[in-house]
């Protein structure tokens, strides 16, 4: 398995029309989860992926499993929990594409993920372990599971990819900054938004982040995503500006995960740092043009067509 990831995937109810939830009566049922999004994005780009999690032994849990499996991602690491329910969220889109989410996930099956759910076999055969800052703040057992996965990855020389994915709603008034910084410092590939960088390190300037994380730290590749402004990618010796890929943004949720999938696919294919950044930018941009987290994710063939048809900067 090329990529292994772990975290919660919820059932997401999406109104068919824009407006406040109080006025909605017609919803689509989809899935939402940063880690499974990345796994699905990578799978669409031609790479194998496995998702580790827990879901309730309920209809929503079955829907989540079927949906992830239908995208080609292995769910061999998913455990059914007969005592806790599958998490649920609602998405609301207002005028101007202002999107907000409401969670009903406290005490969910996935919040009981623990080191016992992580096996040597799952990690040692992987080429990349991908984690986010969402999972470790869900519960103490989830935090321990994340650290156990990293411990195994380091032991088997599996590179770790980490996206802070800061969700202050999940912090519940607690300060998890040091936790997220510690996890980021253990990553080989650190993929974060500019606002997250400012929150964690007091700066979004790529030169300072490069010095702090790549030269003084152990991060091999750093990507700082900045939405419509493009991205900066760097190593200890390179710092490259990635121009934004032109798109018409309809729904930005899931775009960061799509960038991650594209960037990591480049790594798996032995691409240069600049190429990894460009692939990530294209995948992230295209994901915003369709409503839903994963509906706009590119296939390997679609990505190749877009790259071959663009100006030199994207070839």
Locate predicted features:
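Glycine-rich phosphate/adenosyl-contacting loop at the front of the ribokinase-like
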Residues: 1-74, 97, 294, 315
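Short, electropositive alpha-helical surface patch
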Residues: 59-73, 153, 177-187, 247
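Conserved N-terminal subdomain of the carbohydrate kinase-like
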Residues: 48-133, 304-315
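Conserved phosphate-binding/catalytic region of the ribokinase-like
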Residues: 3-4, 151, 205-315
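Structural alpha-helical scaffold elements that stabilize or flank donor/cofactor-binding regions
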Residues: 121-122, 182-183, 215
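Short beta-strand scaffold segments in enzyme catalytic cores
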Residues: 40, 88-92, 230-233
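Short, conserved phosphate/pyrophosphate- and ester-handling motifs at nucleotide-, phospho-/glycolipid
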Residues: 42, 193, 256
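Conserved beta-alpha-beta core of the PfkB/ribokinase-like small-molecule kinase fold
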Residues: 128, 134-211, 229-230
């Amino acid at each position: 398995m090329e990529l292994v990831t772990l975290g919660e995937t919820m059932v997401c109810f999406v109104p068919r029309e824009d407006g406040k939830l109080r006025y909605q009566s017609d919803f689509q049922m989809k899935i939402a989860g940063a880690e499974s999004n990345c796994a699905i994005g990578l799978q669409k780009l031609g790479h194998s992926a496995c998702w580790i999690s827990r879901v309730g032994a309920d209809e929503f849990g079955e829907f989540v499993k079927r949906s992830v499996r239908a995208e080609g991602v292995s769910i061999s690491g998913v455990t059914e929990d007969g005592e806790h329910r599958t998490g649920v969220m609602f998405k609301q889109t207002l005028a101007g594409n202002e999107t907000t989410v409401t969670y009903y996930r406290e005490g969910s099956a996935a919040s009981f993920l623990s080191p016992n759910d992580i096996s040597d076999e799952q990690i040692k055969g992987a080429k990349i372990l991908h984690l986010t800052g969402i999972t470790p703040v869900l519960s103490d057992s989830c935090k321990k599971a994340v650290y156990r996965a990293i411990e195994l990855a380091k032991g088997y020389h599996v590179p770790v990819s980490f996206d802070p994915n800061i969700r202050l709603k999940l912090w519940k008034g607690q300060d998890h900054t040091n936790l997220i910084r510690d996890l980021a410092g253990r990553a080989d590939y650190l993929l974060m938004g500019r606002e997250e960088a400012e929150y964690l390190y007091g700066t979004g300037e790529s030169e300072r982040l490069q010095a702090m994380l790549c030269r003084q730290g152990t991060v091999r590749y750093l990507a700082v995503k900045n939405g419509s402004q493009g991205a900066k990618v760097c190593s200890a010796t390179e710092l490259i500006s990635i121009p934004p890929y032109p798109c018409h943004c309809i729904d930005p949720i899931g775009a960061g995960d799509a960038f991650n999938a594209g960037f990591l696919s480049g790594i798996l294919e032995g691409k240069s740092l600049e190429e990894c950044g460009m692939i990530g930018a294209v995948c992230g941009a295209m994901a915003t043009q369709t409503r839903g987290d994963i509906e706009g994710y590119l296939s390997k063939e679609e990505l190749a067509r877009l790259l071959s048809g663009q100006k030199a900067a994207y070839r």
